[in-house]
Amino acid sequence: MMSFGSADALLGAPFAPLHGGGSLHYALSRKAGAGGTRSAAGSSSGFHSWARTSVSSVSASPSRFRGAASSTDSLDTLSNGPEGCVAAVAARSEKEQLQALNDRFAGYIDKVRQLEAHNRTLEGEAAALRQQKGRAAMGELYEREVREMRGAVLRLGAARGHVRLEQEHLLEDIAHVRQRLDEEARQREEAEAAARALARFAQEAEAARVELQKKAQALQEECGYLRRHHQEEVGELLGQIQGCGAAQAQAQAEARDALKCDVTSALREIRAQLEGHTVQSTLQSEEWFRVRLDRLSEAAKVNTDAMRSAQEEITEYRRQLQARTTELEALKSTKESLERQRSELEDRHQVDMASYQDAIQQLDNELRNTKWEMAAQLREYQDLLNVKMALDIEIAAYRKLLEGEECRIGFGPSPFSLTEGLPKIPSMSTHIKVKSEEKIKVVEKSEKETVIVEEQTEEIQVTEEVTEEEDKEAQGEEEEEAEEGGEEAATTSPPAEEAASPEKETKSPVKEEAKSPAEAKSPAEAKSPAEAKSPAEVKSPAEVKSPAEAKSPAEAKSPAEVKSPAEVKSPAEAKSPAEAKSPAEVKSPATVKSPGEAKSPAEAKSPAEVKSPVEAKSPAEAKSPASVKSPGEAKSPAEAKSPAEVKSPATVKSPVEAKSPAEVKSPVTVKSPAEAKSPVEVKSPASVKSPSEAKSPAGAKSPAEAKSPVVAKSPAEAKSPAEAKPPAEAKSPAEAKSPAEAKSPAEAKSPAEAKSPVEVKSPEKAKSPVKEGAKSLAEAKSPEKAKSPVKEEIKPPAEVKSPEKAKSPMKEEAKSPEKAKTLDVKSPEAKTPAKEEAKRPADIRSPEQVKSPAKEEAKSPEKEETRTEKVAPKKEEVKSPVEEVKAKEPPKKVEEEKTPATPKTEVKESKKDEAPKEAQKPKAEEKEPLTEKPKDSPGEAKKEEAKEKKAAAPEEETPAKLGVKEEAKPKEKAEDAKAKEPSKPSEKEKPKKEEVPAAPEKKDTKEEKTTESKKPEEKPKMEAKAKEEDKGLPQEPSKPKTEKAEKSSSTDQKDSQPSEKAPEDKAAKGDK
């Protein structure tokens, strides 16, 4: 239990924290002056943390009220003040003390009771806690921690209070310090201002002191001067006085006594004199100073005036300086703005100068191009004039020959007899009959001679052909003309053609162009051969147009070409674009496509030509089939050759035709009519340089290239005909020369190719031993074909690629990996192909590559597509009629090529046998090679092209041998090439076989069906030979087509011309 003292201590404390009564009680007790209450309140000061229970607070309330009551009494007593009696005050104070003590005692009693009750409760709680041992320990620890925490809180509160106080004190100190700082700063500034003022005052005082020193020094000097002057005067006076005094001394001494009173008078006199002197000296000095002062004042006035004027000048100068400064700033700003404008103008002028220079360069290039074009057009015009003259001569000669030979021969001679009657009438109209008879008798031998004679006549006609390349091209062109002329004669009338075919071969290209009107005169003939090819084609609106258009292609070509360079352009363009898109090709695509397709030659154009740049490029396709067929149709069977003939004469004779049909088609069809004028013209002024170059854009490029325009184009235009052909396989070799190369790149390339164009036109015709004979004649003739081997070599990029690739497309299809290898191997074979081409130009060219250059190129897009499969058969079939029509002319070629043609036909037959077997494979394989070849072909095509070019030189060296050997050795060198490249031998043989199977079976089966169906319609005469030959050869040419289609697709892919394939697909779909 708690002691009473502790209870007393505890009783007073709870009032302060719990109820605030402690403080009130303390205040009242202080006012009352009761020390007991003061001590009680003091005892409560330590009791802050106690008072846990409400009992103590409740018990404290009565004492609080009592204390309040007693305090009010004490206040009343205090309010009375000292005015009351001391006794009353004492009595009251004692009463109050007693009351307070009683109240306290009562409060203590209450507190004790409450505390005792509280202690009892606490003891009960303690007992309960003791029973709960674990809980008791935790409670103690908890309470201890709570007490410690409370103490810490109190301490921290107190510390925080102290810190706050300290912070406040510090803030106050800081405020005082800042105030002192401000005051000190103000005082310092004041002191500094005072120091500056004092410094200024000191400077002024110093200046005044210096002036005063100067004045004092001057006054001292004057004083010293005056002193000396005065002393001197005094000395002088003394001297005077002494001098007088010496004489007067005695007198004075004597009379001193008497004269004592005179001394004073003397002194007075002296004084008067001295005063007079002093006055005088003073006046003089004053006057001197006055004068000096006047002078100084005048000088000061002058100086002040000068200073005033100087100050005015200074102020004026300052104003001027400010004005000049402002002007300078303005001028600087204007200068900067002008400099910025100048820099901007310079930049603009530089940009303008650059643009003007670019425009000047563009205009110079355009001017140069236009000059080249003008030169080419002039050359074409000259060539056309020469052609016109030759055609006029040929027309008369042919009319005579036709009249005489029709009377002499009569009707129905066999194509061989026709070729014997027609064979080689030289381009010279005077010697036509004699040389034709000689050519009839000695076919193969005389062909070379006729080639020479035709070359001579062509040289006579085209005097600009100076170079050997031009001569070779002229020979090739004359051969093409002779062949085409013979073919035209054959197509015009089998007997008349056979009788006059040599002449027409030599002249008909020009004559068909010039005669094409005449042949156009006989649209029946113009139609009949072509229409003999297909009544549907004859019926086709293209051919329905063809009578006029037969006239127009031939007339548009020949008359237009003969007529003017503009028409030379137009014939060329009419040939190239016009033929590519004109009746020839209008007929041709339609004719090529089918009688049904013939319904819309324009549609045939648009699907075949318009739809696909490849078909647009394969106007060679459209032309080679269509132009090959429809020129024959449009122009006549002769004109069916005349596309080649018109093309070849144009190609052979006119750079415009060679350029425009070939170039207009290749560049224009491929590029533009302007370029159509001359890919080589644009490519090389060399093509502009000579008609032969004009004839062979390639001729401008190289003799070998001059030997073959395609050589020029194929190496030059496309790195290889394969490349040039694949991009424009239909166009550049085929269509670029497709007017001629429509027959074949071979025609544009050389007479042999001009023959093979005819043969290319009728590779199926040329497929007939007749045209292989014609090719052998072309090859027998071919120094030009030896040229054409080069051409074929240069073709061979397409041809070598097409012989090997064209042959190996099937194997490339079957062995496309091998072909990738063998193409690389073929690059050697490109050499051997050059040989094989030199020897095979007839082989590969004659039916296969002659077709395949143009047709494979022309058809390569088509063969890549189903159109190639369908339309190519139609083309071959359409061509086969043309070839049959031409087969009438080829009889001489048949006689010549009977020997070579038979091995080819045998090979073709064996290919036919193999064709059905491989027919299905090639289809899949062609698609594979298309994908696979693109990989192999780009580099391999280049390698083969380079090697073919290399091989082209040797082949050019041995042109005649190769020409003769080409047919005899085609198989041998094919076997040699196969021996060289075992993969290639199979590729070559298979190419022949597989090419025959691939495209042939695609085309052959279709072509055999369609050609057989069309051949009976076209010419039953042609059908017997043409069908067999077409069947034998179409397989090979169609192979080359498939091969070249595959190769062209590879090279097209190489040349990034899958876009052409897409148009070809569209064209194929349109054709379908």
Curated annotation (Swiss-Prot):
Sequence repeats lie at residues 507-512, 515-520, 521-526, 527-532, 533-538, 539-544, 545-550, 551-556, 557-562, 563-568, 569-574, 575-580, 581-586, 587-592, 593-598, 599-604, 605-610, 611-616, 617-622, 623-628, 629-634, 635-640, 641-646, 647-652, 653-658, 659-664, 665-670, 671-676, 677-682, 683-688, 689-694, 695-700, 701-706, 707-712, 713-718, 719-724, 725-730, 731-736, 737-742, 743-748, 749-754, 755-760, 761-766, 767-772, 775-780, 781-786, 787-792, 795-800, 801-806, 807-812, 815-820, 826-831, 851-856, 859-864, 879-884. GO terms for cellular component: apical dendrite; axon; basal proximal dendrite; cytoplasm; cytoskeleton; intermediate filament; neurofibrillary tangle; neurofilament. Its main location: cytoplasm. This is Neurofilament heavy polypeptide. Induction: Down-regulated after nerve injury. Residues 94-409 form the IF rod domain. Keywords: Cell projection, Coiled coil, Cytoplasm, Cytoskeleton, Intermediate filament, Phosphoprotein, Repeat. InterPro entries: DUF1388 (IPR010790), IF_conserved (IPR018039), IF_rod_dom (IPR039008). Neurofilaments usually contain three intermediate filament proteins: NEFL, NEFM, and NEFH which are involved in the maintenance of neuronal caliber. NEFH has an important function in mature axons that is not subserved by the two smaller NEF proteins. May additionally cooperate with the neuronal intermediate filament proteins PRPH and INA to form neuronal filamentous networks. GO terms for biological process: axon development; axon regeneration; cellular response to estradiol stimulus; cellular response to hydroperoxide; cellular response to leukemia inhibitory factor; cellular response to oxidative stress; cerebral cortex development; hippocampus development. Pfam families: DUF1388, Filament. Residues 278-643 are annotated as: 55 X 6 AA approximate tandem repeats of K-S-P-[VAGSE]-[KEVTSGA]-[EAVK]. It comes from Rattus norvegicus (Rat).
